[in-house]
Amino acid sequence: MKLYQYILSGAMSMGLLFSSCSDWLDVTPVDTRTTENFYTTPSQMEQALIGVYNGLLPLSTYALLMSEVRSDNTWCGELSTAQRDYMDISSFNPNISTIATVRDAWNDLFEIVSRANLFLSKVDGVNYTIEGIKEQQIGEARFLRALAYFDLVRYYGRVPLTLVPQTISEAMSTPQSEAVEIYEKVIIPDLEYAVGSLTEEPKDYLGRKSASGRATLTAAKALLGRVYLTMAGFPLYDETKKELARELLEEVIDYADATGKFWAKNASEWQRMWINENDNKYHIFEIQYIVAKDYGNPMVFHSVPRLPSKYVTLEMSGNSIACAKGLDNLLKEEQDEEGHFLDVRCLATIDTTKFVTDNPNSVTKYAGEDFFIKFLEHKMKREALGYDDINAQIVDRTYFPLNFPLIRLEDVMLMYAEIVGPTSKGVDMVDRIRRRAGIPVLTNAEKEPAAFRECVDKERRRELACEGIRWHDLVRHNNLQAVRDKFQEYAVDANGNVIRPTLLLYIRQIKDGTYLYPIPDSQMKVKEGLYVQNEAYR
């Protein structure tokens, strides 16, 4: 049973306590008697903790719009007369401090921080009778706070640091902290505590096995390993963190190998990973979604164009978020003699060659660009994999039930390979993934250090496409040039003629400081002089 199915009614009853702020500093005071009377029992604390998990629900949308769309994985075309957030993000429009996506991501991530802070401020006043439950719940809250702050630092850089609930006046006097301070004072200590307090089998407040979806020891180790590797790259370049990352990631891999967890054995099983009946089976940590109003995966609606009813009855967003040529070519690189794609991930991630239009008079093949179908459980996909149609259950855009992975074993394996290089274990990590996907293992030439680094990068693109990883990889490697190259590829034809001059403007808009997003305009206006706007947007 999924976490939200188990506690949905309880989480919904928390609405008065956890109503979302429209602004990080626009804090509505909560009735003191209500909060003090509520946080008194382990059962109530568990409901409050589920409220913190509930804050993860919108994050899949930001993984798509703020990571994938910003990267060289996607192609969104050229700006039209109608404003679209994803188009402004993709084109590196410098005037994006006012768009909803940039504002909402800030607010939603700080909402998680706020909920975690409130929980942690109350937990010591509660009498827990079952050993270990209090420490586990604290570990979960701190894991989630670290997760939120990690995204805040990666997206916005300098953000306000707060570890306790704040009044309006306190919030309005809290300036930004440097990114390294956020890492050292919140993210790392929180995850270190989580590593020391979480287990592989979380318990509920009565000591029983919990519903799926809660943070585990392996999740904490994997996230801390990712944090350390991020700190070792641009812009901090703290090389001391690389060995710390290696140790943690190796522990995760060794645990997975010893237990058989988190790994799809073959290509067929890998394809079924993206069916909601297999949620909580393969991913190390994932956002929980169910078929219920406002509890479904919101990114699915945004990730695909409008589709014929034979695939999904619900009218989709119609967004023009396509797979960019570079990634498309990577996934289609290996073909057999008849031209069939060997990489099973192509079929499950972007391949639309079998799609047809909804023309009642004739069947016409879809002629547009490949788009991301990994998270869309359309009728044909489920039928081909042997699952019943769930189309009737998808009442609106908020009902898609497929979980969204925040940490996968394959991500851990490839981060580890990046660190250790072409050692026997590093090569094995890459070859395992390639072998399962149906493409050849690395050649001797590809095991040379420079070539191996490139192979790891390519494998991360193929394996983790549409999962919100790519932009952060580009930033970590200080490789915004890859996005410039993407626009250049679309701007110029085979003869070197400029056919899309607007894209040359986009290239000029990619400045060094655009590895960060702007501080939302709504935040900049709350109190003049409190925050300093990121350099590329001043």
Language-model regions, residue ranges each:
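Short, surface-exposed recognition loops and adjoining beta-strand edges that mediate ligand/DNA contacts
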Residues: 36, 62-81, 162-165, 199-218, ...
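Elongated scaffold/linker segments in the mid-to-C-terminal portions of large proteins
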Residues: 49, 53, 57-60, 83-108, ...
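Conserved, well-structured interaction surfaces
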Residues: 42, 46-59, 81-156, 172-185, ...
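Bacterial Sec-dependent N-terminal signal peptides
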Residues: 1-30
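Acidic, glycine-rich segments characteristic of secretory precursors and extracytoplasmic regions
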Residues: 21-74, 93, 103, 118, ...
